[in-house]
Curated annotation (Swiss-Prot):
It holds the Pfam family Ribosomal_L34e. Keywords: Ribonucleoprotein, Ribosomal protein. Belongs to the eukaryotic ribosomal protein eL34 family. One of its GO terms (molecular function) is structural constituent of ribosome. PANTHER family: 60S RIBOSOMAL PROTEIN L34. One of its GO terms (biological process) is translation. This is Large ribosomal subunit protein eL34x. Residues 31-50 are annotated as: Disordered.
Amino acid sequence: MVQRLVYRSRHSYATKSNQHRIVKTPGGKLTYQTTNKRASGPKCPVTGKRIQGIPHLRPAEYKRSRLARNERTVNRAYGGVLSGVAVRERIVRAFLVEEQKIVKKVLKLQKAKEKTAPKS
């Protein structure tokens, strides 16, 4: 006769957060063992891609006590938050904006010089 199995917790619905495995104990009984969800790892909010160099863990596992700082981040600006492509894009955009400001300033000075030159 097949042994009947009962969930060990009160949560009785077959949801994603309540997944179980059937395991045989050393005493020969079958029991349910809760399985952990697979970790997808951190994603870049800009590109949506996985961030390279950071392990795929559940959110609680990234806490200070469980993971060293060098395993939680990547050694660059926005390391561990944005992907390398997104950071490069931001740096280039910031540079181009600054260049545009300088060009605008130079053009304004040239215009002012032209206005003052013909008068004298």
